[in-house]
Amino acid sequence: MSRFCSSAAVALLRGLVSPAALCLGRSMSLYGAPAACAVGPAAGSGGGGGASFSARLSPPWLRLPEVLGAEPHRANELLLLLPPPVPRGVTLAQHHVVYFPGDVQNYHDVMSCHPENFQWEHWSFENIATILARRFPGSFIWVVKCSRMHLHKFSCYDNFVTSNMFGAPEHSADFGAFRHLHALLANAFRLAQNILLSQKSTRDASKEAKIAACKSQQQAVPATNGCSSTERDCECSSNSAVSFPVPAAMGAVSFTLIGFSKGCVVLNQLIYELKEAKKDKNTGAFLKNIKAIYWLDGGHSGGSNTWVTYPEVLKELAETGIEVHAHVTPYQVFDTMRSWIGREHDKFVQILEGLGVEINDQLHFGDNVPSLENHFRVHEVF
């Protein structure tokens, strides 16, 4: 059992509640690293996982629950890791990385308290966001949580693609995944803007009050340059302001889309919808701002359609000029029980290359025995 949960509490509760209920105490706050897992007596002991975990991360985080998409019944939760602060007055071109997780992945406090998934807690939403922030420095990192998790293990992206009980997709050309993603991000941008600007106003008001109080002090120690130490401190306080970047307008930024394992079903559905998305004013403009798409060891429990293999569909992707990256491991493409995955991956690459796409296709850990650990480790090597 994870070090983040009391073994006694888990033993007591395991027979009484479902695994999901073990972590229902997680925070729903919009700002700050997610709170500790509230499980039994350990919840108030000060030894929860959230406090120690947040100390290992660089804030700030924004956790946005139930962000609406294109339709009222479609909503997803998002976790945003902001890029580092920039000096006041500095404006940088914004890039946003949008990540779709795979099975078992969740917030750290949820995974660390799960009787099975705790062993993969290193690949939690927060840790993945941190890895991606290093991989794409200066970018906004968005983690899109699936709308349903069957048996607390199988990620189901029902808002993006028709899915069975375990999240295996049934792709079509008109489900509305592009419309949902565009609206979801637009609404998430606005929510993040409102939160950050509100907090910035509060900080600015507090800073101005401190400067006013500083300058009103009557006593000061003379300095060698003729300025008092109080004046120097006040000047330093007024000039040292930095602020975290706020998401800009959707049309003024660029995007990278990343799917891992089951999360690749979202990318595939987007590809199936490309032809129609190009015709729509909003999704067409959004599409032009997508610079790259990464498939990271895609796979799901269905018997086919792990990779897009229809030439007429992939032709639409080739015409966009979007960078295509495919990173796989033996866990998926060498699986003898799911041999179609490897065949479909090869066909995906072959068709795109035939269409003139310079696809970045890489096999990682090819000399190793297929393992779930290396499947997750693709995040560290792609």
Which role does the model predict for each range below?
Residues 110-115, 154-158, 269-273, 305-310, ...:
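Short coil/turn segments at secondary-structure boundaries
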Residues 2-96, 140, 169:
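N-terminal cap/lid segment of alpha/beta-hydrolase-fold proteins
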Residues 58-163:
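Short, surface-exposed "cap/lid" segments of acyl-processing enzymes
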Residues 196-322, 333-334:
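Serine-dependent carboxylesterase/thioesterase catalytic core
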Residues 4-22, 27, 34, 325-382:
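C-terminal catalytic histidine-bearing segment of alpha/beta-hydrolase fold enzymes
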Residues 117-129, 167, 171-188, 233-239, ...:
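Well-ordered, non-membrane alpha-helical segments in soluble/globular domains
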Residues 146-239:
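Short acidic, low-complexity segments enriched in Ser/Thr/Gly/Pro
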Residues 102-105, 147-149, 262, 299-301, ...:
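Conserved beta-strand elements of beta-rich interaction domains across eukaryotes
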